[in-house]
Amino acid sequence: MSLVKGASIIGASSVISQVFGAFTILFMSSQFGMADVGNYALTLSIVMIGAQVSLYGSHFLLPKVDHEEVGQAVVFCMLQSWCVSAVYVFVVSFFFSLPLASVYVLTASYSMMVISEYMFLRHKAFNTLAIQRISVPLVVFVSLLASPKVDYFYYIWACSHLVLILTWLYKGMDFSYFSKQDFQFNTQKLFFFKHQNHLSRIGTAEVVANASLQLPTVLINYWFSPLVAGYFAVVNRFCLSPVLILGQSVRNYTFSKWSEDFRNKTFNYTEFKQVRLFLVSIAAMTVAGIYFVYPLITEYFGNEQWIQSVETSRLMLPYVFAMLAFVPLTVVELIFGTPSSFLRIQCEQLFIVFLSFVLLPFFHKDYALSLLAFTLLTAGRYFMVYMKINKNASKLNQGILEK
């Protein structure tokens, strides 16, 4: 399957999922208010961080390990999904007043959703992955429609999402991968020690990367208000999320394709250049679209609260460009680079989040200033990372050609 076709299948499903996500935000804002949109965004961010903390990068092993280790890897990931999630939600309960039972089930089931996705990537089942991705936001929207009160929504969402993901796992899992030994403690212990370098470096990097992405919503809710977080959530959903989904679609395809190249000790530098050009082109078009089109959409189809989000959308433009043009290429460092280099990239981004949404609001509580600092620092940082990745890809190509 070609790069464009593989990425397009995942990207098309993501566009459809984005439509359901948009309807969820629209319905929630009109039915319950923008502050509840902020609380929903807070809950989702906490769940997404928890899913990555629970797996701790172990899902990246699913497409990379040999056939004999797939069963061990899946069992290891499932144990993490439920055991680590319990500890994570217990810690979160000290900082936020959230419905713990629903947050726990959501965190564990979103972890299993990632497991299912990466098993589909291993098998290159892009059509099935696309359908799964559409079904997840559809369940959220249906759960909201079925909720007479916003408090009921989280419990209905948690239960329905768990049933959905269990169905996908049952439908898509090849049970011939598993043996009785895969479920034994000693087998899991040996698996952990064999891959502990990956888990400690790549796992930490992935958790930090996800925290850098989700923490702004959490911290805006904390420092400013759920209403301001609602504005940020609207821009995230209608401007940033499509960008992240498109970038993730390319990243998922290249991760699957280049992981196979890694196993075969090759590197397709021509395809790397095609991906690079594709990302920069669509990033430029996306930024122009947000600048000119989003204000018109809010003016003609939104209300006063939606119009208030236009300023946020324009402050986010440098961040949007970096997320689409530069960030998906970090998969090269993830597969072919050293674990420490990928970890360093993510730690530097987390420091930018800390500087923009912790230090700045602590000394001067100004939402626009914090957001502008965050977007400019992120764009500058990822541009430097982008330049380094290009140099490393060129060296990698030359090294392989010499072999």
Place the predicted regions along the sequence by residue.
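Membrane-water interface segments that mark the loop-to-transmembrane alpha-helix transition
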Residues: K5-Q18, L42-L98, N264-G289, I345, ...
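Membrane-interface junctions at transmembrane-helix termini in multi-pass inner-membrane proteins
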Residues: F60-H67, S109-I131, P318-C347
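Signature of the first transmembrane helix
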Residues: S2-Y56, S200-L227, F354, V358, ...
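Hydrophobic faces of transmembrane alpha-helices in multi-pass small-molecule transporters and flippases
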Residues: L3-F20, L100-Y104, N127-I131, T187-W223, ...
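Helix-loop junctions and terminal segments of transmembrane helices
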Residues: G21, M48-E69, V235, C239-K265, ...
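Hydrophobic alpha-helical transmembrane segments
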Residues: A130-Y177, E348-I352, D366-K391
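Interhelical loop/hinge segments that connect adjacent transmembrane helices in multipass membrane
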Residues: M1, A101, N127-Q132, V150-W157, ...
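Interfacial segments at transmembrane-helix termini and the short loops linking adjacent helices
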Residues: M34-A35, S93-T107, M113, F292-F321
